[in-house]
From Swiss-Prot:
Keywords: Ribonucleoprotein, Ribosomal protein. It comes from the Bacteria. One of its GO terms (molecular function) is structural constituent of ribosome. PANTHER family: 50S RIBOSOMAL PROTEIN L33, CHLOROPLASTIC, LARGE RIBOSOMAL SUBUNIT PROTEIN BL33A. This is Large ribosomal subunit protein bL33. GO terms for biological process: translation. Gene3D superfamilies: Ribosomal protein L33. One of its GO terms (cellular component) is cytoplasm. It comes from Campylobacter hominis (strain ATCC BAA-381 / DSM 21671 / CCUG 45161 / LMG 19568 / NCTC 13146 / CH001A). Belongs to the bacterial ribosomal protein bL33 family. InterPro entries: Ribosomal_bL33, Ribosomal_bL33_CS, Ribosomal_bL33_sf, Ribosomal_zn-bd. Pfam families: Ribosomal_L33 (PF00471).
Length: 56
């Protein structure tokens, strides 16, 4: 199977502590804007806003 060129691997970085706690894939064709999700941060032991960053 061919790899889909539109799907990009991204990281979700905690806005409070700065840790990259989650990685996921995003389709740039359908979701052009940056993702912001409320996810659990294990360091702070609470739910915080996680913002999308590029992974190298």
């Amino acid at each position: 199977m061919a790899k889909n060129a539109n799907r990009v691997k991204i990281g979700l970085k905690c806005s409070e502590c700065g840790d990259i706690n989650y990685t996921t894939y995003k389709n740039n064709k359908n979701t052009a804007n940056k993702i912001e999700l409320k996810k659990y941060c294990p360091r702070l032991k609470k739910h915080t806003v996680h913002k999308e960053i590029k992974l190298k």
